[in-house]
């Protein structure tokens, strides 16, 4: 068309607007990450939340650049020749995406996860969140709920206590600070020495579950269930979490099974009750509560009292489990205020909110955020279930603005939002028909294939390299510490980056017992030396630096 501007269809304009908004979001995230780099966030720091900013500074520049370039290329194609694209496709392109793609996605995702888990010294528990649930699982295997401390020295109960393991009310035992169901599920895998297999199987189940939910929503002959399964399977965060013993893959699977039950025919919805009990007691009730709340609110609005009462009964049972487990420790529940885990957000947390959204997108396959935005832009076309999925994502973002450790500390991708990855995949699939209509079937599938290839063969290996870089020093240092002959080893926890995470002891306090050097007083040290009849060994910083553990910078004098 010469001499006049082409009048674009509404679909073209909405797609272009979605691309532009995504580019703005990624660009804003890039500016924040650049600021972290310039302020030295790539180096070690003593703050417990600093690892979040360090991972952003070290790990995000390349994925952000790749997401930006990919989106620019899609925008260029849509703007340059949208009319021709929609009518150009090969005969084979009209065939729906078959279930074989789902099977291939499961196989490839599991293979990559296996490789990374083995490379991580058998999914070494880099974070104390991972170690604590395994600690509790080992207690269950020994036939105990609480680990009775085998010591006559009272102060050892604290100076030897690992992070996220808490003293019981009487002070004579230890118990995990997390709810018990995930540790129960972990037991057979911990017993055979492959605890990470649980999350690998959870991932396989999640891909199959999201495809099943997609077929419930859109029918078996639609491309969207397969697109949702591929979107989930190719997510770097999805694969990375399965190479760990974080509880998040289990949360994701149970949420998807719960949704499948709610959407099922006949009396299938009855399974939503016991599944809610499992989900609410995996390790924390919040991940499932945020996911399920919009669906439960809709039951109230539609006056579906029967289903609501059934699920509420199981929620009450879950609350009893939470109260009982809390009673094993201090009996305190999360509260607002200076001493609670919840607090009122401030302006700085809005920046963290932006970063959470960015991580949710940049750890996904590059096309998926665009498809999700396209689908959500057509809000009037979304079904009740699709809207509830979107509301669950928004609720998760909003809740963690009020969480004291809003930056999540350790975690690959946006760990706090892992339970909504299925929602992201399903909402991304809602944008697929419009994207395909604008760019054409053949072009759409090519962009999808490129997105999946970049995620699996470029982004995930990049993420895995960072996981290895950060985790292996702690794995090797931990093995070395466990091989030392002394009864007590004092770790210079205040001089090492995340030095407190090296203190990992069973309740039996088998040798060597690792101690928090920062918490041990001189008098307590003398008591230990007198008990042993020989000096307690102080581990030097240089002894641990040989494995790659980093020294903390000395604080500036005031």
Language model: regions and residue ranges:
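Hydrophobic, aromatic-rich transmembrane alpha-helices
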Residues: 1-3, 71-80, 205-211, 292-302, ...
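Transmembrane alpha-helix segments characteristic
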Residues: 26-33, 103-113, 226-228, 232, ...
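Signature aromatic-anchored transmembrane alpha helix within multi-pass, membrane-resident enzymes
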Residues: 97-107, 226, 270, 311-319, ...
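Transmembrane-helix signature of polytopic, membrane-embedded enzymes
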Residues: 102-105, 210-236, 252-253, 266-271, ...
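Multi-pass, polyprenyl lipid-linked donor-dependent membrane glycosyltransferases
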Residues: 128, 196-208, 227-257, 262, ...
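Hydrophobic/aromatic-rich transmembrane helices and adjacent perimembrane loops
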Residues: 133-134, 248, 388-391, 409-436
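Interfacial juxtamembrane loops and adjacent helix segments
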Residues: 142-182, 186, 340
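Membrane-lumen/periplasm interface segments of specific transmembrane helices
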Residues: 280-374, 396
């Amino acid at each position: 068309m010469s001499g006049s501007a082409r009048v674009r269809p509404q679909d073209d304009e909405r797609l272009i607007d979605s691309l532009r908004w995504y580019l703005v979001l990624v660009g804003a995230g890039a500016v924040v990450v650049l600021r972290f780099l310039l302020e030295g966030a790539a180096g070690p720091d003593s703050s417990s939340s600093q690892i979040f900013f360090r991972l952003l500074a070290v790990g995000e520049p390349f994925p952000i650049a790749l997401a930006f370039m990919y989106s620019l290329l899609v925008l260029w194609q849509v703007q340059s020749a949208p009319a021709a694209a929609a009518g150009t496709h090969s005969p084979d392109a009209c065939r729906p995406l078959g279930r074989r793609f789902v099977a291939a996605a499961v196989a490839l995702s599991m293979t990559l996860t296996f490789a990374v888990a083995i490379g991580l010294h058998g999914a070494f528990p880099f974070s104390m969140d991972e170690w604590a649930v395994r600690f509790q699982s080992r207690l269950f295997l020994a036939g105990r709920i609480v680990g009775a401390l085998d010591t006559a020295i009272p102060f050892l109960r604290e100076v030897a206590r690992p992070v996220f393991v808490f003293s019981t009310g009487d002070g004579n035992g230890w118990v995990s600070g997390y709810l018990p169901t995930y540790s129960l599920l972990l037991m057979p895998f911990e017993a055979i020495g492959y605890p990470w297999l649980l999350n690998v199987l959870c991932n396989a189940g999640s891909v199959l579950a999201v495809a099943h939910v997609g077929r419930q929503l859109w029918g078996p002959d639609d491309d969207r269930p397969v697109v949702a399964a591929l979107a989930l399977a190719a997510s770097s965060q999805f694969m990375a979490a399965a190479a760990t013993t974080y509880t998040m893959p289990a949360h994701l699977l149970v949420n998807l099974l719960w949704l499948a039950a709610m959407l099922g025919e006949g009396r299938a919805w009855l399974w939503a009750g016991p599944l809610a009990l499992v989900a609410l007691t995996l390790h924390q009730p919040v991940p499932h509560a945020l996911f399920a709340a919009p669906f439960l609110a809709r039951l109230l609005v539609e006056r579906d009292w029967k289903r609501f009462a059934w699920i509420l009964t199981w929620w009450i049972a879950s609350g009893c489990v939470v109260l009982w487990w809390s009673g094993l420790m201090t009996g305190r529940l999360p509260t607002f205020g200076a001493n609670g885990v919840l607090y009122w957000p401030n302006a700085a947390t809005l920046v963290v909110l932006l970063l959470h959204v960015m991580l949710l997108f940049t750890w996904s396959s590059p096309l998926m955020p665009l498809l999700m935005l396209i689908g959500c832009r057509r809000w009037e076309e979304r079904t009740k279930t699709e809207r509830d999925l979107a509301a669950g994502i928004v609720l998760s973002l909003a809740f963690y603005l009020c969480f004291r450790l809003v930056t999540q500390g350790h975690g690959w991708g946006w760990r706090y939002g892992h339970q909504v990855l299925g929602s992201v995949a399903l909402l991304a699939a809602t944008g697929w028909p419009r994207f395909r209509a604008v760019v054409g079937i053949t072009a759409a599938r090519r962009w999808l294939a490129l997105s999946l290839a970049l995620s699996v063969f470029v982004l995930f290996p990049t993420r895995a390299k960072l996981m290895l870089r950060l985790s292996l020093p702690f794995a090797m240092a931990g093995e070395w510490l466990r091989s030392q002959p002394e009864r007590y080893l004092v770790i210079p926890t205040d001089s090492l980056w995340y030095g407190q995470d090296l203190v990992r002891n069973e309740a039996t306090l088998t040798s060597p017992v690792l101690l928090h050097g920062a918490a041990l007083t001189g008098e307590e040290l003398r008591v230990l030396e007198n008990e042993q009849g020989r000096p307690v060994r102080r581990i030097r910083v240089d002894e641990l630096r040989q494995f790659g553990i980093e020294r903390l910078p000395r604080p500036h004098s005031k």
